[in-house]
Amino acid sequence: MPIVEFRIDPWSSEGLRDYEKLFAYFGVRPFKEVIHRLEFFGPLPLPIRRGAVIGHRDFERVLHALENNSDFAILTGLMPSGKMHLGHKMLIDQVIYYQRLGAEIFLAIADVEAYGVRKLSREEVINIALDEYVANYLALGLETRKLHIYFQSNYRREYYRLIQLFAKKVTMAELVAIYGEDLEPAKIMAVLTQAADILHPQLPHFGGFKIVLVPVGLDQDPHLRLTRDIADRFSEELGFTRPASTYHKFLTGLTGGKMSSSKPESFIALTDPVNESVSKLMKAFTGGRATAEEQRRLGGEPDKCPVFELNQLHLVLEDEELRKIYEDCRSGTMLCGECKLATAERLRKFLEKHQEKLASMKEKARSLVELPDF
């Protein structure tokens, strides 16, 4: 089967849904194989507990670190090119969980890529990164202990040295095979920079963490595959080991398809006015039938419903409550309008509480990061 059929574009991977086929092709293991070992360390965050995290590479190494009280690090990044929405929250919920288990957190602000590939101004990039993302992360519960936040354009010289060294052992043919032929210089720079993001915590200058976990959506797997190959090529010279990774599903957008920052109608942003967010929710696509009569007879389809997914991954904490919502929908006992009203009230309470915390976090966010000079 030609590789082009399975190529994943990290800059535009709309509609990636056939996870099992993709995982089999790229050698990703089901996360359900290892989740029972993670349960030993306490309550799991909703994305893990309710099946949104579906795949992994080498997660056993992270489990070994936890079981032996060894150090490990999390590398995550943010793309400051739009509003932070609930799809992004699904990732940071995982990061906060691992931080509470003792992980050192490295948070890369991808300002180089936002400027070079997404074509935003430097001022926009910096303001979005801090006010829209870092501040929200802090309000959601990310702690400042064991936390390292940096702009890709304003970090330490050892990090930049990695980018230069990596360029020697990566070929254009390899990049084209992974990313396709539409590779402008800005994308090549972004790719090598992300490899440095993922591997630099292993250097002694940054703590020498030999176990680094990168939780991502499947669209970012091309970067992980390339970085694992780079780690192999520098295993003797720099002592690098392959990073571990986990993969989560995309959160379904309110209009169907992927929740995306480029489609405002598809997402619930954490900073939007509460009434505006509730209004979006009330207009959302659902897993309901064509008529109320048909839904009472056949039942709804919560597994296809973005409104149910918001409850599942963000708004309903108790499993028994979620189970009742699911069963009432499937049986036709509850219609979509009733479900939307109840979900809207949960969303309102969540956003009001979150935005109250957020108000005090913007100044704190700016105090944690050294800003680029230009």
For every predicted segment, state its role.
Residues 1-78, 212, 228-282, 288-294, ...:
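Non-catalytic terminal extensions that flank enzyme cores
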Residues 1-2, 134-136, 169-181, 206-222, ...:
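Short flexible/disordered coil segments
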Residues 2-73, 80-202, 356:
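N-terminal Rossmann-like or analogous alpha/beta NTP/dinucleotide-binding catalytic cores
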Residues 84-89, 96, 111, 121-125, ...:
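Structured ligand/cofactor/substrate-binding pocket environments in proteins
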Residues 86, 118, 122, 160-161, ...:
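Short amphipathic alpha-helical patches
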Residues 146, 172-178, 281-296:
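Short amphipathic alpha-helical segments and their helix-coil junctions
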Residues 147-164, 190-200, 288-299, 338-348, ...:
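Short secondary-structure transition/capping segments
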Residues 157-163, 226, 254-258:
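Short, solvent-exposed polar/charged micro-motifs at secondary-structure junctions
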